[in-house]
Swiss-Prot record:
Residues 1-19, 279-292, 403-412, 428-439, 621-632 have a biased composition (Polar residues). Residues 391-395 are annotated as: CTBP1-binding. Residues 357-378 are annotated as: Leucine-zipper. The lineage of its organism: Eukaryota, Metazoa, Chordata, Craniata, Vertebrata. A zinc finger (C2H2-type) spans 315-340. Residues 413-427 have a biased composition (Low complexity). One of its GO terms (molecular function) is RNA polymerase II cis-regulatory region sequence-specific DNA binding. Residues 1-23, 279-306, 403-440, 619-686 are annotated as: Disordered. The leucine-zipper is required for dimerization and transcriptional repression. This is Forkhead box protein P1.
Length: 686
């Protein structure tokens, strides 16, 4: 069957050749007769004859192609019937058989001749002499001979591939990689020869056009883009197009299933170059236009790269410290590869640039933090007297109205978390709420862990982990809570002193500076707190946490006036009781406690001023030496008196809010950084 199909295709090619040569022979005879009579060729008669001849040639080519397609379909049907009856052939061979019998493409079957319309234009323009017409016919014959040689070469190559595939199938062995590579190289060489032949034809037609033998209108496509002659019936064209497209789809499906490079990919028309040919030679095309446009596309791509490259701008190299002038992007690439190669100097410059970027990122984080604080501040001013968000759980604003003061002793502060807000320095200890008006109470600073009376949890740090790692802000936790958290996060629930230091510096950017200050505080807290237990093991001395002892220190003792206890019970979630030392100081100075009954007293502001002066007077005799129990404040006061800090008041309010920050160092219930004995609490407070 394969040999029969090969002989049929050869006979078809010879028929096409005879038809085309016969048409050209008739044209030559007519021209010789005209020349022998000594007459000039008539434009009308010559155009009609040429049109008729070209239509005859095109019809012959189309009919031959249709007949070939029908014969191949019949052969395939017969083969399928034989395979169903005998059942001897494998399904793989059945799948490969349609792919092997590939029809010759339309571009191969149709000679690249001049269309009737173009020949008519040549005759109407009367620019060709009989000698020029004879030369043109000779050139057309040479083109047809080239086409025939190309077809024969194509058929030979296809027969060789069929024989190789049949031998491999009969042997029952898969082709090895060297054989596959050899077949692939042969196919590539064949495709390159096809492209070279098409390029030669294209160049020949272009030379004819340049010599003035052919004229193409601006709206008319180029010569190779002309499919069949335009004298065919539209129904025949549609049928021919359907046959060709169906054969191409079948060939592509077969080639995809077998994942083998088949010659069917080359069987496309001259107007649509194959993908493999484009991959082999991207600068070659059947219409000769791709090679003209590819340099422009490359130049455009280089321009885009030059605009987008971060190291090149305005003709200057943007490498740090270089600023070399480069004429174009190509010279810049050469300069980049030669001057800035991978060496010690480039590596050092890259490290410097990394440090610059890190500093800029830190500065950006600070600027963002400042912007957030400004926005928060403006938001606070615009929403007064409502409860407003304050920076990072450190400040709580308490608002008391007249109705609220009558209904409850104190209103509940509102402290939403704003992790991007700035951190303000605070001091440890309970806050004393002193009201100078019936309408509001100023912001009260207190420590997060003291305010909520719960130990630090991993969720508190994990929630703002990235913020603490990048921003140099003071974490709102005591050193004892941070040390406990570091030990609990370790796998063995024990850490050496150096490992505790490393945890501090790894989790908080604030501790990467001033190491001497906070490391001393960590050592003092480890030695003074009973909840931290030192254990000797193989590594050396490690520190563990006694949770029971740590939890014993957390609950706060409530003592003093029953009215104070009542107030604390009503607002125990957010408010803390007065310090015992503060109560004793108030009792000595005969300052009554502020309850709901005394809030309406008109002399409340005077009493608050007296208490503030008395407490601030005791501050002058304190000793500033001692260990710092919080990363966010100055060292603790080791003496008994209490330090009260006055918050700035609003200038436009006569009776503005008063907020006091107290630091009580004698009570272990509030001081989680020192271990002192409980002092006797004065119970005679009125």
């Amino acid at each position: 069957m394969m040999q029969e199909s090969g002989t049929e295709t050869k006979s078809n090619g010879s028929a096409i050749q005879n038809g085309a040569s016969g048409g050209n022979h008739l044209l030559e005879c007519s021209l010789r007769e005209v020349r022998s009579n000594g007459e000039t060729p008539s434009v009308e008669i010559g155009a009609a004859d040429l049109t008729h001849l070209q239509q005859q040639q095109a019809l012959q080519v189309a009919r031959q192609l249709l007949l070939q397609q029908q014969q191949q379909q019949q052969q395939q049907q017969q083969q399928q019937q034989q395979q169903q009856v005998s059942g001897l052939k494998s399904p793989k061979r059945n799948d490969k058989q349609p792919a092997l019998q590939v029809p010759v493409s339309v571009a191969m079957m149709t000679p690249q001749v001049i269309t009737p319309q173009q020949m008519q234009q040549i005759l109407q323009q009367q620019v060709l002499t009989p000698q020029q017409l004879q030369v043109l016919l000779q050139q057309q014959q040479a083109l047809m001979l080239q086409q025939q040689q190309l077809q024969e070469f194509y058929k030979k190559q296809q027969e060789q591939l069929q024989l190789q595939l049949l031998q491999q199938q009969h042997a029952g062995k898969q082709p090895k990689e060297p054989q596959q590579q050899q077949v692939a190289t042969q196919q590539l060489a064949f495709q390159q020869q096809l492209l070279q032949m098409q390029q030669l034809q294209q160049q020949h037609l272009l030379t004819l056009q340049r010599q003035g033998l052919l004229t193409i209108q601006p709206g008319q496509p180029t010569l190779p883009l002309q499919p069949l002659a335009q004298g065919m019936i539209p129904t025949e064209l549609q049928q021919l197009w359907k046959e060709v497209t169906s054969s191409h789809t079948a060939e592509e499906a077969a080639s995809n299933n077998h994942s083998s490079l088949d010659l069917s990919t080359t069987c496309v028309s001259s107007s649509a170059p194959s993908k493999t040919s484009l991959i082999i030679n991207p600068h070659a095309s059947t219409n000769g236009q791709l090679s003209v446009h590819t340099p422009k596309r490359e130049s455009l791509s280089h321009e885009e790269h030059s605009h987008s490259h971060p190291l090149y701008g305005h003709g200057v190299c943007k490498w740090p410290g270089c600023e070399a002038v480069c004429e174009d992007f190509q010279s810049f690439l050469k300069h980049l590869n030669s001057e800035h190669a991978l060496d010690d100097r480039s590596t050092a410059q890259c490290r410097v640039q990394m440090q610059v970027v890190q500093q800029l990122e830190l500065q950006l984080a600070k600027d963002k933090e400042r912007l957030q604080a400004m926005m928060t501040h403006l938001h606070v001013k615009s929403t007064e007297p409502k409860a407003t968000p304050q920076p990072l759980n450190l400040v709580s604003s308490v608002t008391l109205s007249k109705t609220a003061s009558e209904a409850s002793p104190q209103s509940l502060p509102h402290t939403p978390t704003t992790p991007t807000a700035p951190i303000t320095p605070v001091t440890q200890g309970p806050s004393v709420i002193t009201t100078t008006s019936m309408h509001n109470v100023g912001p009260i600073r207190r420590r997060y862990s003291d305010k909520y009376n719960v130990p630090i949890s991993s969720a508190d740090i994990a929630q703002n982990q990235e913020f603490y790692k990048n921003a140099e802000v003071r974490p709102p936790f005591t050193y004892a809570s941070l040390i406990r958290q570091a030990i609990l996060e370790s796998p063995e629930k024990q850490l050496t002193l150096n490992e505790i230091y490393n945890w501090f510096t790894r989790m908080f950017a604030y501790f990467r500076r001033n190491a001497a200050t906070w490391k001393n505080a960590v050592r003092h807290n480890l030695s003074l707190h009973k909840c931290f237990v030192r254990v000797e093991n193989v590594k050396g001395a490690v520190w563990t946490v006694d949770e029971q002892e740590f939890q014993k220190r957390r609950p706060q003792k409530i003592s003093g006036n029953p009215s104070l206890i009542k107030n604390i019970q009503t607002s125990h979630t957010y408010c803390t009781p007065l310090n015992a030392a503060l109560q004793a100081s108030m009792a000595e100075n005969s300052i009554p406690l502020y309850t709901t009954a005394s809030m309406g007293n008109p002399t409340l502001g005077n009493l608050a001023n007296v208490m503030r002066e008395e407490l601030n007077g005791a501050m002058e005799h304190t000793n500033s030496n001692g260990s710092d129990s919080s990363p966010g404040r100055s060292p603790m006061q080791a003496m008994h008196p209490v330090h009260v800090k006055e918050e700035p008041l609003d200038p436009d309010e006569n009776e503005g809010p008063l907020s006091l920050v107290t630091t009580a160092n004698h009570s272990p219930d509030f001081d989680h950084d020192r271990d002192y004995e409980d002092e006797p609490v004065n119970e005679d407070i009125e």
